[in-house]
Amino acid sequence: ERTKHQPEFNRLAQMYYKHFTNARYVYAEKYRRNIIHAFKKFQDMGKLEVITCGATHGYLPLMNNNVNAMRAQINVAVQHYEKHFGRKPRGIWLPECAYEPGIDQLLKDAGIRFFITETHGILFASPRPKYGNYAPIYCPTGVAAFGRDMESSRQVWSSKEGYPGDFSYRDFYRDVGFDLDYDYIRPYLHGDGKRTNVGIKYYRITGK
C-alpha cells in the first residue's frame, strides 16, 4: 500500500510480501514451527548431512591448557545433536575452522569421523596432500579433515570477487529499518525501539 505509486519499489515490496508469506507458511504450517525436525527428515532420507559445531563456538586451540574445556565443547555439542537428531553427528565444523594436533583425538573419542578446517591447514600439511584442498586427508587417528573451499567462500564474503559487491544484487547495508521514517517503522522494531535491519532492502549495490 505504501509503495503503490512507486512502481520501482512496489515490485520489490510485492516480492518480499510473497517471500515472507511463503516462509511463514513453510515454518508455521508445513513444519509446525519445528525446523530441526524438517532437517532430520531429509537427513534420514539421505538427502543431506547435518553436522555439528562447538557447543559455544569456543576457539579450541586457545583452550589447549585445559583439555577438559576442549572436550566439553565437543561432547556437549554431540549430546545436543543426538538429542534432536536421534544419532551422533558424523562431522563437525570446528569453531573458526581452527585445528591443532590432538583435537582429532578428542573428536574420535566423541565418535566424530570428520571435521572442517581452514584451507591452509590442508595445503601445508606434512606430507603435502596430492590433491591439495580438493580431497580430505586423514589424521593419524583416522579422523578425516576437509579444507574450507576458498573459491566458494569468496563468492559469499568477498566484496570484490563475490556477489556481496556485484551491482546485480541488493545492498545488504541499505535496509528499511534505517531508511524509513521512524514513526512508520517503529511497530516493526524490537521492544527497545532501536533501529535495526528488518530484512527488506530496496537498493542495489552501487559502490563500496
Please place each PLM-identified region on the residue numbering:
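Hydrophobic, small-residue-rich alpha-helical packing segments that form membrane-like cores
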Residues: 83, 97-113, 128-131, 142
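Short, solvent-exposed turn/loop segments enriched in Gly/Ser/Thr/Pro and often Arg
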Residues: 54-56, 91-100, 120
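His/Asp/Glu-enriched short active-site or ligand-binding loop at hydrolase and phosphoryl-transfer sites
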Residues: 59, 112-125
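Active-site cores of enzymes that catalyze phosphoryl transfer or operate on phosphate-rich substrates
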Residues: 1-64, 69, 126-208
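Glycine-rich loops and low-complexity Gly/Arg-rich segments
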Residues: 75-79, 116-119, 139-141, 169-173
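Beta-sheet entry/capping signal
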Residues: 47-51, 88-91, 104-107, 111-118, ...
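Generic structural signal for well-ordered alpha-helices
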Residues: 36-40, 74-78, 104
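CE4/NodB-like, metal-dependent polysaccharide N-deacetylase domain
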Residues: 67-94, 208
